[in-house]
């Protein structure tokens, strides 16, 4: 599993074999899929390589596919044949997005209709607006990123939108830091876990869940 996203009705599970499986959130029954049934890779409209990130935003499913960001209409994703679910368009990032074959070091977060992605290689956060991505007269719509927040001294890893702020972990650090989603500026320290390297994070029912990249374990900590 590369990543998961949850909407009001569906659970999206992105796999490494060029496929996104969709389940009903209430019943957990399989609904549909995006991608080839044979799991083969390719460059055409129905093929993907690896799912590095998934987030739902305004009836759109945004998929981080290695160094590409694609958008899908959720209603098409749950009704069209798996190998014929078309994407709405792509996001063009000026400097490109760095990647490798470790999806665990790539983060995505949605805040107020904008999508944020950690770019470990370029030491930055990429920012774009999914609602700009529309199908116009049957043609794809490619959009550009709204902003790129640069961080010369750190390499971003995990990312989470919570309480009107962005929470971000950095490489070789047990720190989770708070950032302003409008400017990308550092606001302060949320928490620090010595001797750990924090990857993806989630907060639920007052608990912080995170991946300790050093140990390869899912950890939890009680919030304040």
Predicted regions and their residues:
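Conserved core beta-strand positions within WD40 beta-propeller blades
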Residues: 10, 60, 114, 165, ...
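Conserved beta-strand positions in repeat-built beta-propeller and related beta-rich domains
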Residues: 13-18, 63-67, 117-123, 168-172, ...
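Short loop/turn segments that connect beta-strands within beta-propeller blades
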Residues: 24-28, 76-80, 129-133, 180-184, ...
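Short coil/turn linkers that define WD40 beta-propeller blade boundaries
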Residues: 28, 69, 80-82, 123, ...
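Blade-level signature of beta-propeller repeat domains, shared across WD40, Kelch, NHL, RCC1
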Residues: 196-224
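Beta-propeller fold detector
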Residues: 30-38, 82-94, 135-149, 187-192
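Beta-rich, blade/repeat-based domains predominating
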Residues: 1-7, 39-57, 94-111, 148-163, ...
């Amino acid at each position: 599993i590369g990543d998961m996203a949850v909407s009001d009705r569906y659970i999206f599970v992105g796999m490494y074999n060029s496929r996104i499986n969709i389940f009903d959130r209430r019943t957990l029954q399989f609904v549909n899929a995006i991608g080839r049934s044979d799991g083969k890779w390719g460059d055409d409209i129905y093929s993907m390589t690896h799912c590095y990130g998934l987030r739902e935003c305004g009836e759109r499913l945004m998929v981080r596919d290695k160094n590409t960001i694609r958008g899908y209409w959720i209603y098409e994703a749950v009704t069209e044949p798996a190998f014929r679910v078309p994407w709405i368009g792509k996001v063009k990032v000026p400097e490109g997005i760095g990647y490798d074959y470790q999806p665990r070091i790539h983060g995505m977060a949605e805040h107020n209709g904008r999508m944020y992605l950690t770019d470990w290689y370029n030491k930055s956060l990429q920012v774009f607006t999914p609602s700009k991505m529309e199908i116009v007269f049957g043609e794809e719509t490619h959009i550009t990123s709204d902003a790129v927040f640069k961080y010369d001294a750190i390499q971003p890893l995990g990312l989470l939108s919570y309480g009107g702020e962005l929470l971000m972990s950095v490489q070789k650090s047990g720190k989770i830091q708070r950032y302003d989603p409008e400017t990308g500026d550092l606001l302060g320290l949320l928490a620090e876990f010595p001797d750990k390297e924090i990857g993806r994070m989630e907060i639920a029912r007052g608990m912080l869940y995170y991946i300790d990249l050093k140990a390869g374990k899912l950890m939890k900590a009680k919030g304040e």
